[in-house]
């Protein structure tokens, strides 16, 4: 290459001039100088053979070079008969393996309709760029990339010039610093990096996507490794059909993508010491779907002992898209498309193994909105039970966990109904909520109540007619349900027994054309700051106009993340110090990130004005956690008829409503039965059973009579039940007080006449045994009926095959009636006093 690029053009003249001779001499000198200054290629030994990497300088004077080992195999190729099977250890090799090029990515297809609602903004806005990272996919794709920091002479020199009294400078200048020492102002023992000259912490990144696409090759871990003095690892794992197909039985159990991640962690645990890493300080982190994978890994016994800490960015195992509860349905659809739909699942899987990977991944199988077609499944092994049950049992308490969300995660959920200039109309708002309820909760009897209550909660009544306000609240609705509530519940369950937990809310994003100007920090906006992209400038995937504030915030985030990987505490050992960017101190130097606990719920607001706050969106979290599950089952608990709003009979034939997606695709949903806005039969918009179904929603302003009637009915019902319960208890107590007066005296030996005067009803009440109920059922025609005491049995999410399942958030203790309803702990779905570390009984759950 040098001969092609650096050799000057020489003339064939027999008598070269002095100038040409001088150029030739200078060229040879430059070659010698380049060869003498070029660092030798790093090599490292592993249990499977030797690797040769490359030392790569970074385009920043504060960042030292990084040794990169790309395309390191961590498992045997899952090809042929090994397709749809757990991974196996990689084969050994002889000689030195060249690890200087990215490996092939796992087979995937981003040219069909991708589920944009689950993908980060920087991914969906740059699909053409993303396509360049997934060219020439191959089933032989189970490789990882290792980024190892080296000595940073330039950064040390700059730090010593700025602070000559630092220990590393007093010991003999920058040249005396050992590889691995941090540049923090560690004059005090409390600021010392506990492993300065020893083994480095390891951070393993699980890429996101939608379980259908993605690769670790898209994320460069060099800046994070160099700045944070940690070893960063990215990896590929099987995605889509090849990674998560499941028949629901032993023929194809599924979860191969998760098993790939576990095998990668096993390889790291056994080999990272050769790279200078500490196998006792391995942190797994990810964003979006990657965060859901991390959350699931903390619940699996297969990953025990393979890592110690987890950073969960904008995701949770409790999100609706984290687990696939209908794997057989989508496997059958795939088998139909490729001609493998046979009754015997073993034969079906054998047939699918004979198909090419390209044929399988190119099949366009669209899941229900807010769900996944191919993803992790509850198989009784890798994921032994429902994630919320596992969290209740404390399966993840041995890990230190840091987790959080971005301010406007739900941007992609509303982009299709948003006018960039005018906001969201009232009709679009109503339709979005109705579609949300249909896709997540199906068509329960109490769907109208649930829908109207959600709209009530997410209407800004002080500015209800402002389209921009509707747009903001609609983004908040999806953000709260899909990200905030699952993350807060995860944090509560992890922290309630004292396990180290840290929570954050990310409120900053770079300026770019990838999303609207009105948007907040959207899904995936924290990723460039975690990996230090602002320090090296815009990239093809992150074409932002980074400012000094962006560089400062990226340095802050990397310090927090790497501190947590080092000690389990984001505040130490390295203090926040970005004076090499700004001459004045940043606000983070005065902020101490407090631990999270279920009572105070302290979290760090990460933005240009950082602060520690408490109870992040507590009202909305309580709404989704406690009220919505009861509203969903409202029809089963009691029946009532609204007296203020005319409700049409339920529409048993749901017509199909086609909606254009932002990317040009269409998706079909069933039209919900909408209550009319006005009860006047003569009004233009009134409902008429003889008329054909009109538009989905009326354009006229609504008077919210339905919401008012629902609120009044629910409140009155609860009040009435409380009065009945109180009256029953008072009646029983009064009877017990009067019972001694009615019993015969021993001296008199009589008393039968007194008892005989009591009515038969009172006599029966006095003779009730302890197994009877205090309140018997009323006449069958009563609107409200008091039944037996509630049976709090853990109800899993189940649904018919033709409607999507409920979200993981709807696992709740559902009473059979409202009588005797026990008070639930604010952070627990079990009744107060129940030991949540174990299930209520061995038969209280049913595997979906």
Curated annotation (Swiss-Prot):
PROSITE patterns this protein is in?
A: CARBOXYLESTERASE_B_2
Q: Note the PANTHER family from the entry.
A: NEUROLIGIN
Biological processes, Gene Ontology terms = adult behavior; axon extension; chemical synaptic transmission; circadian sleep/wake cycle; excitatory postsynaptic potential; inhibitory postsynaptic potential; learning; long-term synaptic potentiation
The organism is Rattus norvegicus
- Cystine links in this protein are 106-141, 340-351, 510-544
Q: What is the role of this chain?
A: Cell surface protein involved in cell-cell-interactions via its interactions with neurexin family members. Plays a role in synapse function and synaptic signal transmission, and probably mediates its effects by recruiting and clustering other synaptic proteins. May promote the initial formation of synapses, but is not essential for this. May also play a role in glia-glia or glia-neuron interactions in the developing peripheral nervous system.
Q: Which residues carry this modification: Phosphotyrosine?
A: 792
PTM annotation, UniProt: The N-terminus is blocked.
Cytoplasmic compartment residues: 731-848
Q: Where is the signal peptide?
A: 1-37
A Gene Ontology molecular function term for this protein is: neurexin family protein binding
Task: Please state what the protein is called.
Answer: Neuroligin-3
On subunit structure and binding partners, the annotation says: Homodimer, and heterodimer with NLGN1 and NLGN2. Interacts with neurexins NRXN1, NRXN2 and NRXN3. Interaction with neurexins is mediated by heparan sulfate glycan modification on neurexin. Interacts (via its C-terminus) with DLG4/PSD-95 (via PDZ domain 3).
Q: Where is the composition biased (Polar residues)?
A: 645-656, 677-689
| Entry similarity comment | Belongs to the type-B carboxylesterase/lipase family.
UniProt tissue specificity = Detected in brain and on hippocampus neurons, especially at excitatory synapses. Detected in retina (at protein level). Expressed in brain, spinal cord and dorsal root ganglion.
Which residues of this chain are annotated as glycosylation sites? 98, 545
Task: Give all Phosphoserine modified positions.
Answer: 745
């Amino acid at each position: 290459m040098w001969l092609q690029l650096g050799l000057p053009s020489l003339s064939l003249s027999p008598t070269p001039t002095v100038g040409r001779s001088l150029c030739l001499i200078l060229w040879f000198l430059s070659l010698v100088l380049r060869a003498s200054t070029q660092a030798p290629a790093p090599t490292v030994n592993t249990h499977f053979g030797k690797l040769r990497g490359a030392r790569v300088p970074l385009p920043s004077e504060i960042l030292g070079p990084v040794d990169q080992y790309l395309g390191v195999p961590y498992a045997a190729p899952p090809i042929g008969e090994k397709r749809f099977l757990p991974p196996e250890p990689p084969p050994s090799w002889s000689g030195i393996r060249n690890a200087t090029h990215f490996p092939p990515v796992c087979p995937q297809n981003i040219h069909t309709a991708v589920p944009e609602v689950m993908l980060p903004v920087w991914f969906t806005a740059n699909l053409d760029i993303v396509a360049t990272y997934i060219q020439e996919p191959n089933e032989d794709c189970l490789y990882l990339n290792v980024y190892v920091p080296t000595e940073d002479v330039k950064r040390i020199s700059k730090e010593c010039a700025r602070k000559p009294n630092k220990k590393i400078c007093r010991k003999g200048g920058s040249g005396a610093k050992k590889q691995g020492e941090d540049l923090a102002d560690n004059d005090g023992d409390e600021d010392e990096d506990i492993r300065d000259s020893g083994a480095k912490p390891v951070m393993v990144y699980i890429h996101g996507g939608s379980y259908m696409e993605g690769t670790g090759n898209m994320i460069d871990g060099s800046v994070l490794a160099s700045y944070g003095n940690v070893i960063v690892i990215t990896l590929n794992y099987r995605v889509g059909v090849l990674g998560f197909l499941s028949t629901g039985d032993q023929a194809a159990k599924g979860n191969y993508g998760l098993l790939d991640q576990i095998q990668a962690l096993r390889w790291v645990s056994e080999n990272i010491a050769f790279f200078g890493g500490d196998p006792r300080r391995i942190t797994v982190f990810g964003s979006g779907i990657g965060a859901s994978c991390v959350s699931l890994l903390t619940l699996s016994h297969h990953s025990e002992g393979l890592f110690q800490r987890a950073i969960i960015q904008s995701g949770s195992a409790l999100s609706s898209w984290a687990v696939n509860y209908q794997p057989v349905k989508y496997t059958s659809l795939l088998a139909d498309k490729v001609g493998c739909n046979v009754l015997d699942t073993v034969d079906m899987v054998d047939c699918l193994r004979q198909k090419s990977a390209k044929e399988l991944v190119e099949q366009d199988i669209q899941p229900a909105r807010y769900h996944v077609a191919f993803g992790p499944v509850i198989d009784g092994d890798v994921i032994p039970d429902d994630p919320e049950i596992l969290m209740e049992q404390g399966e993840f308490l041995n890990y230190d966990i840091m987790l959080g969300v971005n301010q406007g995660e739900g941007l992609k959920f509303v982009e299709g109904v948003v006018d960039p200039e005018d906001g969201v109309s009232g009709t679009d708002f109503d339709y979005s909520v109705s579609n949300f309820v249909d896709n997540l909760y199906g068509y329960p009897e109490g769907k109208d109540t649930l829908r109207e209550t959600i709209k009530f909660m997410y209407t800004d009544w002080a500015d209800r007619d402002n389209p921009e306000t509707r747009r903001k609240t609609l983004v908040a609705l999806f953000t709260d349900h899909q990200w905030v509530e699952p993350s807060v519940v995860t944090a509560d369950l992890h922290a309630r027994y004292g396990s180290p937990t840290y929570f954050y809310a990310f409120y900053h994003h770079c300026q770019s054309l990838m999303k609207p100007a009105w948007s907040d920090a959207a899904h995936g906006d924290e990723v460039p700051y975690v990996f230090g992209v602002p320090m090296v400038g815009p990239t093809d995937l992150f074409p932002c106009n980074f400012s000094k504030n962006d560089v400062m915030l990226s340095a802050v985030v990397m310090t927090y993340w790497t501190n947590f990987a080092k000690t389990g505490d984001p505040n130490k050992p390295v203090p926040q110090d970005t004076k090499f960017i700004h001459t004045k101190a940043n606000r983070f130097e005065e902020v101490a990130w407090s631990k999270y606990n279920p009572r105070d719920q302290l979290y760090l607001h990460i933005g240009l004005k950082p602060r520690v706050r408490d109870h992040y969106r507590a009202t909305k979290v309580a709404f989704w956690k406690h009220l919505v599950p009861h509203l969903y089952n409202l029809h089963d608990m009691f029946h009532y008829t609204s007296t203020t709003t005319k409700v049409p009979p339920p529409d048993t034939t749901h017509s199909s409503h086609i909606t254009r997606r932002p990317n040009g695709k269409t998706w079909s949903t069933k039209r919900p039965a909408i209550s009319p806005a006005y009860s006047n039969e003569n009004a233009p918009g009134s409902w008429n059973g003889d008329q054909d179904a009109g538009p989905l929603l009326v354009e006229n302003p609504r008077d919210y009579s339905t919401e008012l009637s629902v609120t009044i009915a629910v409140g009155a019902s609860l009040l009435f039940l409380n009065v009945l319960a109180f009256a029953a208890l008072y009646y029983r107590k009064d009877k017990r007080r009067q019972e001694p007066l009615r019993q015969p005296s021993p001296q008199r030996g009589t008393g039968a006449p007194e008892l005989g005067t009591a009515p038969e009803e009172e006599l029966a009440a006095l003779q009730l045994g302890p197994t009877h109920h205090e309140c018997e059922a009323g006449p069958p025609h009563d609107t409200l009926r008091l039944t037996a005491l509630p049976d709090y049995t853990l109800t899993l999410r189940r649904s018919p095959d033709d409607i999507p399942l409920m979200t993981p958030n709807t696992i709740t203790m559902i009473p059979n009636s409202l009588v005797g309803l026990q008070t639930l702990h604010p952070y627990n779905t079990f009744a107060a006093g129940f030991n949540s570390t174990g299930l209520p009984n061995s038969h209280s759950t049913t595997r979906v």
